[in-house]
Amino acid sequence: MGKTVLGVFFGLVLVMAGASASYALQAGGVEVGDLETGSVVGQSFKELDVDAQLFAVEIGDLKTWYPPVTIIDFKVRPGRPVLLKVTNKAAAEHGFQMTDAANAGSPFVMKAEVVLKPGETKYIGVPTSDMFYATQGNTLTYRCHLHPGHVGGKILMIK
């Protein structure tokens, strides 16, 4: 009886330890905010250089995120967090979702998501460790998660 209770207790401890690690990975280190008030891993967005600027634009009937491809070379930049500036230049509300498409179904995937009003700008800070370890490949995809028909783009990471 004592061994059974001990075994059940030990099993519950393992399950809880795994669950807490899972929640920690799901939360990730991705932070969304304004330039003045936002921060990631203890560094203010104001102190960081913007690595890429992305814009929701309308070209005729085409609604897209521009530029379609952005390259970040980690071999030549310091190990500081990645800072993205996303701006909605369109007339309607648009979403911005960035994730690793290769393992998007995983509970551990890195994911950033924000909704932008017309003319609104937000900053997305991502720890370098999340860019390397919470992604499977070298490519992140971004798109408007509010309107699936809109054209998205890719961030290519040179590691």
Regions found by a protein language model. Name each.
Residues 45-81:
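N-terminal edge beta-strand
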Residues 86-90:
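Asparagine-centered strand-capping/turn motif at beta-strand->loop junctions
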Residues 95-99:
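Beta-strand signatures of extracellular beta-sandwich domains
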Residues 25-34, 42-45, 114-159:
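Extracellular/periplasmic metallocenter environments
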Residues 69-71, 79-81, 91-93, 111, ...:
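Extracytoplasmic
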Residues 66, 102-111:
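Short beta-strand and strand-turn-strand segments in soluble, beta-rich domains
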Residues 52-61, 75, 100, 123-131, ...:
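Short regulatory "switch" loops immediately downstream of catalytic or recognition motifs
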Residues 1-58, 131-133:
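Extracytoplasmic entry segments of secretory-pathway proteins
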